[in-house]
């Protein structure tokens, strides 16, 4: 697939060069990417979940896939009418950094998961490393967000409220 080729030929080396290696818990040297419509309540506009990494998948336990896997949304991430797989490339880099970060922090260093705000910042940096460009798409949201204007803290990661402010 086009998505897999982009990951293998471009994203993988760029992200691992800056952030380190992924784990290999199943000893197959493969990373799985599951693309599906993440049921996130998207109503046609606003925020949606573009993808995610679930650290439990790296463990041999119940409700785990027991492998290196991350998940990419197909709706609306690929577009609503004309599907464009290239719209997911930055999300691939973003979610891959989460996997690497967990491997480095927890498995290699024996620590705990990195604070969400810092881990998300590093995943945003992975997007920039991959594209070679500054991420400017969120500047308008930052400038006009009412929660940021009211003092929304960089250190407080609000998963239930104004999620887009976290990424701005």
Descriptions of predicted regions:
Residues 1-115, 122, 126, 132-136, ...:
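Juxtacatalytic substrate-recognition/specificity segment
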